[in-house]
């Protein structure tokens, strides 16, 4: 399973997503879109918006901290 979290350092909801994944023992790639414009463009292409967090779980894109959607995507 490949998990990416597009976030910024100052976003409280981004920290909630990352804490949630860490608590579940899920490894993920943390991508700081504030420091990486190329990654920010990639995030916008996937999600259609500029807001963070955006979580990509094996191609399922979840905008915001949607616990149920994240759990469903993790379950496959």
Residue ranges and their predicted role:
Residues 8, 36, 67:
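ATP/adenylate-binding site constellation spanning eukaryotic-like Ser/Thr protein kinases
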Residues 28-39:
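Thiol-based oxidoreductase modules, predominantly thioredoxin-like and allied folds used
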Residues 1-24:
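Local sequence-structure signature of Cys/Sec-based thiol-disulfide redox active-site neighborhoods
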Residues 53-61:
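A short, hydrophobic beta-strand/beta-hairpin element that forms part of a small beta-sheet core
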Residues 72-76:
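Short hydrophobic/aromatic patches at helix-to-coil boundaries
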């Amino acid at each position: 399973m490949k998990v990416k979290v597009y976030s910024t350092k100052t976003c409280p909801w981004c920290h909630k997503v990352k804490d949630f994944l860490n608590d579940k023992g899920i490894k993920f790639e943390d991508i700081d879109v504030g420091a990486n414009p190329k990654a920010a463009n990639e995030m916008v292409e996937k999600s259609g918006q500029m807001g963070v967090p955006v979580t990509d779980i094996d191609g399922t894109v979840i905008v915001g901290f949607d616990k149920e959607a994240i759990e469903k995507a993790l379950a496959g």
